[in-house]
Curated annotation (Swiss-Prot):
BP GO annotations: defense response; phylloquinone biosynthetic process
Broadest EC class assigned to this enzyme: isomerase
One Gene Ontology CC term in the entry: chloroplast
Regulation: Not inhibited by Tyr, Phe or Trp.
Taxonomic source organism: Catharanthus roseus
Classification of source organism: Eukaryota, Viridiplantae, Streptophyta, Embryophyta, Tracheophyta
Protein name (database record): Isochorismate synthase, chloroplastic
Family: Belongs to the isochorismate synthase family.
Gene Ontology MF terms in the entry: isochorismate synthase activity
Length: 580
């Protein structure tokens, strides 16, 4: 058990009356979820409300310490049912013992001798009522790339190929494969842009001594004053420390229950315990294997925004800007949103299960607030990872399909590796990331040679970086500096971002934003590409994008969008001709 003096938190009791309705219409600026929402203003901050008793950690003093941060590990058991019994007893004991601290966070965890997949556990829970929920799986079951100057010189692989090993300070943390969580011990959400104070508000609840207390979530691609209705529940950012968490480890598992409170924000210790017990009563201890041969869903229609004609016009507009000697633009990343209507509701976790079977060289994630759609993804790209003061990042750009044979695959990789247009696009991304790391880190190692990163269906140009931060506060600088990278926005960033805001006909929301977790000693964030927003009433929004540079061809780039969206489209049977 570890107990430290941390920072103070802000809480809020959420009482929402929202109802969500998916796909109200499909015009360019359509809001795909219409719902009534209750909003109140507290301490000059706009606060979201939800039906569960929880606290919004963004509403207190980010620099005031939380009274206690603890992890208590109970004896191991053989099954999830026994683990929940042990947790329930431990939580009841907590209720009978009032802490001296006015605020705090306590994690109770029970190891399980059996190996159970976190996604199976999450799918076995009540998917309609046990919200919010989250899921995060590291790339190739590895979250942090550990390499040195010698490694960079001698290796030409990627983390996905198993050359890099994970480093950590906790045996359980070291063995962690994936995490699933339900309920909210503390959440962090606001319509305002993610700030240093928001980062501090999250970090106050975290400790190096409690590495598995983590805040999982995501940040929008771009903060804007008017968030589209389908993204409203996520705010400008959304992070949650789950009340009940299932950790999948190598060869074993673990169930944890977390309680967080702050008297100053009107959520007392006793209230937090009752809220946790209410959530635990809904948790199922029976875990069924999630079938990976999804889906019985058939595709009725598909509508792209922009459509092919508008795409060609916008891409040619980018090329004109790039060719203008008075314009600073050298690259703009354009995106497409595909609205699909299906014969039945899509199971977001079944889609994730299919991605896990399809290939392990990517991060898989799911984030779903209360009364909101599920944001899921299968992204190959890391924004950054942090272990203590060491930070990792990577450049990933340019795309080719995989070949049907080894010889064709090698030929396509060679074409990618030698293409002037693709190398120019990749060079923009790599140099920009290197410069941003140089500006923040005391030292930076750059992989001297680019390589080809091979995924299940596509391949990219790829290079890695490692740097040393001056202080832990530099984590926020890394996040705010690296995002958005030229791989999802363009270059120069502000010029590309302005072009996107003025020309893109939909709200990207969390698409292409940072998705991952903050921890006390470690953090890991992917880039939320290859993602979709899945709601109720039979439908989804599928997002894909690509970089436009000098030499880009509208027809070829459209084909690349189709290739990137294919991981989702292949999961649906064709019921009727898709709309173009």
């Amino acid at each position: 058990m570890a107990s430290i003096t941390g920072h103070c938190v802000a809480h809020f009791t959420d009482l929402s009356t929202r109802k969500s309705s998916f796909f109200s219409n499909s015009n360019n600026n359509s809001s795909l979820f219409r719902r009534k929402s209750t909003n109140i203003v507290t301490r000059k901050k706009y606060i979201f409300c939800s039906t569960s008793l929880s606290m919004n950690g963004c509403n207190g003093d980010p620099r005031a310490p939380v009274g206690t941060i603890e992890t208590r590990t109970l004896p191991a058991v053989s099954t999830p049912a026994l683990a929940m019994e042990r947790l329930s007893s431990a939580v009841a004991n907590l209720k009978s013992t009032l802490p001296s601290a006015q605020s705090g966070i306590i994690r109770l965890e029970v190891p399980i001798e059996e190996h159970i997949e976190a996604l199976d556990w999450l799918h076995s829970q009540d998917q309609k009522n046990l919200l919010p929920r989250c899921y995060f799986s590291g790339r190739s079951q590895v979250t942090f790339s550990d390499f040195t100057s010698n490694d960079l010189t001698n290796r030409n692989g990627s983390a996905a190929n198993g050359h890099l090993q994970r480093i950590s300070t906790s045996s359980d943390d070291k063995n962690l494969v994936s995490v699933a969580g339900v309920g909210s011990a503390v959440l962090f959400r606001s319509p305002n842009p993610f700030s240093f104070d928001d980062w501090l508000s999250i970090k106050r609840f975290l400790s190096k001594n409690c590495p598995l207390i983590r805040a999982y979530g995501a940040i929008r691609f771009d903060a804007r004053p008017h968030i589209a209705p389908e993204w409203k529940a996520f705010g400008s950012f959304y992070f949650v420390v789950p009340q009940v968490e299932f950790d999948e480890l190598h060869g074993s598992s673990m169930i944890a229950a977390t309680v967080a409170w702050d008297n100053a924000l009107s959520l007392t210790y006793q209230q937090a315990i009752v809220a946790l017990q209410t959530t635990m009563e809904q948790v199922s201890s029976t875990v069924s294997k999630l079938r990976q041969d999804v889906s019985h869903t058939s595709l009725v229609s598909k509508a792209n925004i922009p459509d092919r004609t508008s795409w060609d016009l916008t891409l040619n507009r980018v090329l004109e800007e790039i060719g203008n000697k008075y314009s600073p633009l050298t690259k703009v990343v354009l995106a497409r949103r595909s609205q699909v209507i299906t014969t039945s509701d899509i199971d977001p976790l079944a889609w994730l299960s299919s991605f896990k079977a399809d290939g392990k060289d990517a991060y898989q994630f799911c984030l779903q607030p209360h009364e909101a759609p599920a944001f899921i993804g299968n992204t190959p790209e890391q924004l950054f990872g942090r272990d203590q003061l060491t930070v990792f990042s990577e450049a990933l750009a340019a795309t080719r399909a995989r070949g049907e044979s080894d010889s064709l695959d090698l030929q396509m990789a060679h074409d990618l590796f030698s293409s002037p247009k693709d190398n120019h696009e990749f060079a923009i991304v790599r140099e920009n990331i290197r410069q941003k790391l140089d500006a923040i880190c005391t030292s930076v190692e750059t992989e001297p040679m680019k390589s080809v990163r091979k995924l299940k269906r596509i391949q990219h140009l790829y290079a890695r970086f490692a740097g040393r931060l001056r202080s832990e506060d530099d984590e926020f600088k890394i996040l705010s500096s690296l995002h958005p990278t030229p791989a999802v926005c363009g270059f120069p960033m502000e010029d590309a971002r302005k072009f996107i805001a003025e020309n893109e006909m939909f709200d990207r929301g969390l698409y292409a934003g940072p998705v991952g977790f903050f921890g006390g000693a470690q953090s890991d964030f992917s880039v939320g590409i290859r993602s979709a927003l899945i709601g109720k009433d039979a439908g989804a929004l599928i997002y894909a994008g690509l970089g436009v540079v000098e030499g880009s061809d509208p027809a070829l780039e459209w084909q690349e969008l189709e290739l990137k969206a294919s991981q989702f489209m292949k999961l649906m049977k064709l019921e009727a001709p898709a709309l173009k």
